[in-house]
Amino acid sequence: NIGHSGADVVIVLNDNERSYAPTVSMLGNSLVKLRANRTFRKNEEKLARFMEEIPLIGKQVVKGVGSAKTAVREYFEPTSFFEDLGITYLGPFDGHDLKAVERALKTAKGLKGPTLVHVLTQKGKGYGPAVNDPIKNMHDIGAVKEGSFTQIFSDTLKEIMTENENVYAITAAMPDSTGLLPIQDEFKDRVIDVGIAEQHAVTFATGLAMGGKLPVVAVYSTFLTRAVDQVVYDAALHKQKVIFCLDRAGITGTDGPSHNGVFDMALFTSVPGITILAPASGKELAFMLKEATKSEIEGPIIIRWPKTAPSQLVPFFDGDISQSQCVNESKDSQVLLLGVGSIVPNCIDAMEKLRTEGITAECWNVRSVKPIDPRLIERILEVKNVVTVEDGIISGGFGQNLAAQLGTKSNVMIKVLGVADQFLEHADVDSLQQKVGINADGIASTVKETLK
């Protein structure tokens, strides 16, 4: 669009040969070729500065020689990728040489039409720990922690891929953070990094599924929102079994407002034929992933888990992955607490708090966000008072879908807890859960209000 418009726009390409991870694409290869001109550009700049200093005629000489050099260069070199798009290309320049960058920007500003200034930089330059980090150049300080959901996913997927050569793992430029890096070397042809291209990752995975393979897409919850169209119209519409493993689902806290994975349930529960699973423990994640690869489920399967460490509070349940789990069945329950995924431990804590106040609550681990377990519906119709708790946007989420499924004739009092109509600010997970009322105290308080 910019090239077609001819607008006077200056684009700065900060080229450090990386994105989140090493760059993967033919565009990246094109930049490699452009970087090869670096020595020529340096000598060119020195010559220009020398000629510019010639008294009286310096600037005219530079202008004339510049035109000649351009003609010679275009004769011997093909046009750059950007020039084919109608964008004037300048560079590459040393991005750490401020004077060189300033000269380049001034030159670009004086040109008509869109101009791209290509600067070469080193990611993490000047900071030893970043420069010496071979994986991400300290893009962030996070890492896959021992015993985390991500580590459990990585170990389980390695086991699955060892047993089943039809399983492929796909990442969009995040092999380290999603847990695929430890298994990438062992399965070089089956762990595929498509670059920062989530839409392509989903369509590519769908193509693999159509070809008889079993693709597992490892992606942060917040980044799958970029590929909603592909999930719906490529994978789901064609009933292709693609397993989407959503790390950082729910409230991530200190990752910032853009990284809270609170929209996935609301976005995908409305999609026909999709299955959404939310493990409440690390052991349950491993179980669900194995069962998902073996099951006869038709269509996409989403498994979502949080950044926070797995809880040991939730007893393991090896029932079918479509079934919900009653954590503490009670015949005289006054209220049902229905927790989704990582929120189940909060519900268990709330249940204990309520018990000390003489209120009997029955806690359920939902497990299957979609489809909803018919056994759970039956129990709801018996108890009548229900509080659902999820770490996602309320609108369109599990609780609202449950209420819609129950309808207006069920005479059930249902209260839905989750993230209201807002973007959450940067803060720790505990503070944000308290703010939206899905910590143990908030849940207990809501139950007492419901029973009044």
Where do the model's predicted regions map?
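Short beta-alpha junctions and helix-cap segments that line functional grooves
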Residues: 104, 230, 288-289, 375
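Short acidic-hydrophobic, aromatic-tinged amphipathic segments that line or gate anion-handling sites
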Residues: 93, 276-279
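Thiamine diphosphate
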Residues: 4-137, 142-186, 193, 199-203, ...
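Extended, hydrophobic alpha-helical segments in both membrane/secreted and soluble proteins
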Residues: 1, 179, 191, 198-218, ...
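Conserved glycine-bearing catalytic or ligand-binding loops at nucleotide- and phosphate-handling centers
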Residues: 278-296
